[in-house]
Regions:
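Glycine-rich, small/hydroxylated-residue low-complexity segments
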Residues: 23-484
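Gram-negative bacterial Sec-dependent N-terminal signal peptides
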Residues: 1-22
Length: 484
């Protein structure tokens, strides 16, 4: 888990004076305690380290932190975090954890949260050279969290439960950073949201339930600047307050530069099966939901991609009118991407010109240069990857890209294909007259007339922009239609 990674990294990176110890000793425990206390800026009682054979038993207790919070009506508690460390030599440490966890937070009148994990079992090998776990597995069971939020006279109750979760990760050194991969799986996920009626009229109660028997996520990271990031955190802890940071801003900026680009690339693929959503109107469902996310870090080749795939979409009975039943998509894939932007250049420009002793810290002319640095071509590219919507009556596909920027005319090209337009039109014509669906007929007729028809009845539209701001559909400038 992230908490174990941070605590262990602080211990090893911050407490290097502890040395590489083959056996646990009282002296080693004292050094580790002092190192952790210094990096957590905490007093006695927060960190306890004791020899336990060839390992050290470590306990981190957050109670002294919470005791310093004097806000009226606030209370918090967290089970002390416990684990063991055993020196493996060569800058590697074996990490083991086996405990339940419970935590609660309360801010009177606004928040009341109570969560617990029946069991956390984790083991891994922490590598000082990487600043993270070369390998790690974590198993959690019996996770529940109940939260009550009160805002503007409305009370919302949120409940989350997960039967089991398994996480396995691996990291390898790669230059000044690390490459990593991992997989997360969980079972019996359920979330309930219940909102009471508000004090004002027109605010009825609402209840929702989201459930999935299984979820999996595969994730990768390239060029992760883990060690540099944690060294920045340690530096910030050692320089509390804005005055301390301003006094050492040159060093601070060097630490920030060392963290860049944060990562070269990260990606994640999430899959959920048999998703159900319970609402006051009935139950909706998805047989399979897929989400893909990919992004580059603070690099010159900026990139962001998100894709969604839904199979077996179902809506509550009675929600869709009979004429539209066969228009409801059973499958769709939407794939968006953004590219041709630069994050490295503006980051360098900002750091090179940042002066925390002045106000504003960045001169206005530098702020104006940042936009140009982000878009060296004057625009970004926005793409629609191969996307599709499939229903019983039709199959719609689309793909294309466009460029857009503050100083340039949008330009792009897209290809759209549709099979089943006549069937769609027949379904719309069958709608009750009061719904006004028949009014769409002229537009459908025009669209069909502009399409190129294939042998199988598939219609194709190639949509392009012109430098003058026009729009061509299969070569016809639609902006000049109708006498314009």
């Amino acid at each position: 888990m992230k908490t174990s990674l941070v605590l262990l990294t602080v211990l090893l990176l911050g407490g290097s004076s502890a040395g590489a110890m083959a056996a646990a000793t009282p002296e080693g425990a004292q050094r580790l305690t002092a190192a952790l206390q210094a990096y957590l800026t905490a007093g006695p009682g927060v960190v306890t380290v004791t020899p336990a054979g060839d390992a050290y038993a470590v306990k981190i207790d957050a109670a002294p932190f919470f005791a310093k919070i004097k806000e009226p009506g606030f209370s918090a508690s967290v089970t002390p975090f416990e684990f063991t460390l055993a020196d493996q030599g060569g800058g590697q440490w074996k990490f083991d954890q086996d405990q339940p966890i419970a935590y609660s937070f309360k801010a009177e009148g606004t928040l009341d949260m109570n969560c617990k994990i029946s069991s956390i079992k984790g083991t891994g090998i922490f590598d000082e050279a990487i600043g993270g776990f070369a390998s790690q597995t974590v198993d959690l069971t019996g996770m529940t969290c109940d939260e009550t939020l009160t805002e503007q006279g409305k009370t919302t109750k949120i409940g989350i439960s997960i039967a089991t979760m398994h996480v396995a990760t691996a990291l390898t050194a790669a230059g000044a950073g690390a490459d990593g991969s991992g997989k997360l799986t969980l079972t019996d996920f359920k979330e309930t949201v219940s909102t009471a009626a508000g004090e004002t009229a027109g605010s009825p109660p609402m209840d929702f339930t989201l459930a999935a028997p299984s979820l999996s996520e595969d994730f990768t990271g390239k060029g992760l600047k883990i060690r540099a990031s944690l060294e920045l955190v340690a530096w910030a802890v050692a320089h509390p307050g804005p005055d301390a940071v301003k006094a050492a801003q040159a060093e601070f900026k060097d630490k920030l530069r060392a963290v860049l680009p944060v990562f070269q690339n990260i990606s994640a693929v999430v899959s959920m099966d048999k998703v159900t959503v319970g609402t006051m109107m009935g139950e909706a469902g998805i047989d399979k939901l897929g989400i893909t996310v990919e992004a580059n870090g603070v690099v010159a080749e900026g990139k962001l991609r998100e894709a969604f795939t839904v199979d077996g979409l179902r809506l509550p009975q009675g929600l869709i009118p009979p004429f539209a039943t066969d228009l409801l998509p059973s499958h769709f894939t939407i794939d968006f991407n953004v590219s041709d932007f630069d994050l490295a250049a503006p980051a360098k420009l900002a750091l090179d010109n940042l002066d925390m002793s002045k106000e504003p810290q960045l001169a206005p002319e530098i702020e104006a240069q940042l936009t140009a640095a982000i878009m060296p071509k004057g625009s970004v590219s926005i793409g629609l990857g191969p996307s599709e919507i499939v229903a019983k009556l039709y199959d719609l596909k689309a793909e294309g890209s466009m460029t857009a920027g503050p100083m340039s005319m949008p330009a792009g090209r897209a290809t759209i294909t549709l099979k089943g337009l006549d069937e769609v039109m027949a379904a719309l014509q069958a709608a009750p007259p009061e719904m006004g669906m028949q009014q769409m007929a002229p537009m459908v007729i025009v669209a069909k007339g502009m399409a190129k028809a294939g042998a199988d009845g598939t219609l194709t539209w190639i949509v392009e922009s012109t430098p003058q701001g026009g729009v061509l559909v299969n070569g016809v400038d639609v902006t000049k239609m109708g006498g314009q």
